[in-house]
Amino acid sequence: MKNFLIHLISFILIISCSKDKGENDEVVADDRMANSAITNIYASGKVSEQTAAEAKQTIFGKWDVSGSSSKNMSSSKSLSECTFNFIEFTDKSYIMSLSITGPDGPESGSIFGNYALIEADGLVTQVRLYFSVSGDDVHIATLTNIEVVEKASGGFDATFDINFEIDLGDIDIVCADLGGSYSADKEPAMEETLSAGVDSNHYKMVRNWQMTSYADSDGLVLSDVLLDYCLRNQYDPVMGEYTEVLDPDCIVPSTFQVNLSTFGTYVTMTLDESGSPLEIQTGTWTWANDEQTQFYVDDDWTGNITELSTTNWQFYEVHDTTDFRADYNFDAVA
């Protein structure tokens, strides 16, 4: 069961990247997106000179910050050393991936939530990042001076300033202050993006989903999967073996969500009853065939789609070496 949950957690995001073009009529279309219903991936410019609709397209994408260092980064010895891996914006959400080097060795951390474009006189002055705590959105960081430039050689560069409004330790990210000025390269979108019309599986798949049912050949159902999050191995000296016990200090998740982006990112979240995340994981996904009926997760997990629309997603996994099969059912989250 533990191995299953690891695969499930490491497979399944909340990053929603598709929008009907009709919602962005005021933005000039890019001819390169003529056959796609996905948000424009070619937008550029100074966000401070753009409307909210324009700025949303400009920041849309996965921005690799791993080669950039903040000019103002703190060097506190009492906190872990942290660096940005990437920050990705979708139409409504963002995911920030961090590398953390602490006393117990390297690990990764992720911050996910909604963002807001703040305007003055019709132009965007800042982008605010929020994180859900006990069901409330907390303003954790502010981005300003955002500029995206399309390079003559292809691709896009971005520069921006970020200021953290809270101590990251308040959301269990034990890092020194990451505020400062950064530069970033935009990661390429998945090839299927440019041909993702509204009837394509790619367009239907790229959104935020919540698991509504699960069943496998071992007899487990969704409630077992959620409970498994709080199970721990404990040694029984009488029996001389390890058994699974429920951690009394653990909050059993209420729901499980996944978000798939058109830049090949997935975000998985286990959520408490208030809708706030207990755990966030990120990774990559790709299509396994041209028909877009199979997909890979982290190059080692295959899902087989049986039903897919903009509101419902059903798929199954099978293990070639065993008789194990698991069926998943998700509904889209607005």
Where do the language-model regions lie?
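Lipid interaction determinants
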Residues: 22-112, 121-334
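Sec-dependent signal peptide recognition
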Residues: 2-10
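C-terminal motif of bacterial Sec signal peptides marking the signal peptidase cleavage site
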Residues: 15-16
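Short, conserved catalytic or interaction motifs in soluble domains
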Residues: 19
